[in-house]
């Protein structure tokens, strides 16, 4: 039985939590604990392969082994992350883009309400909830924000009312009303998503902000459910692909920064996880360099005059991956 289905009924029988725990333990053991040590080289490090063409959206994929899916949510998974440590005299720095897909959607669509939220520096889910529910930003409740978060992420993947109902945990009538109000509030975003679908139907592909194409052959399928899947791919590809473009520009710009500052022996990019870059840095310069690297990430679009929408990144320093 699918894990997600077992999660829904885990309180209905005392054996189900044990089944879930067993599955987690066997997964951790086979995929990480037993396997990862076999990839360690003589220098004590794992040298994975990052594949430029491993994803249709332009994101890197990682293999031998895949270091982009090291567990992060569970307590046991966090212990696996703690095994990835900085070298002697070094520390790890994580620079993580904040809500980059939604920022990409704001840039591509030009939706005034979404752009306003980011330019004001408001939490995007709080800002969304305030505008959909018609309250001030400081009056948004945690439940309102939770519902806004469900649709913010889902809408970029072609989410409909049925999926929104499940994500919000409400009756269909309430989900429909919320969906309709969201469409009204962020009308330009919704128009843009429809335009993307129409473009994909006409030309067979979509493009990112920097021009990366994603072919959508499923739109030609004789099967309706595959055509619907093709539409969801068409909607998401420009947004997720633009996010991938941005992180790759950040990789280029941070490399330039390191070279210009002559820090190539002190700062090294060691891991890329979609919207996050992980560096290994000499401990004595970590604090000052961390802020400068964040500034580099935040300027990748503005310095190229591609967009004036604020792109924000956060940073965390720590001795291992669990901490950051």
Label every PLM stretch briefly:
Residues 291, 302-303, 307, 311-324:
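RNase H-like nuclease module associated with reverse transcription
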Residues 47-48, 53-55, 130-265, 269-272, ...:
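Conserved catalytic core of nucleic-acid polymerases
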Residues 1-75, 89-91, 101, 161, ...:
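Conserved "right-hand" nucleotidyltransferase catalytic core of DNA-directed polymerases
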Residues 4-29, 115-134, 299-311:
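Charge-dense polyanion-binding interfaces
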Residues 279-283:
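Short beta-strand-to-loop capping motifs
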Residues 85-88, 262-265, 270-274, 291, ...:
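A structural signal for short secondary-structure junctions
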Residues 49-136:
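Function-dense linear segments that define catalytic or interfacial modules
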Residues 290-297:
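Short amphipathic alpha-helices in soluble, non-transmembrane regions
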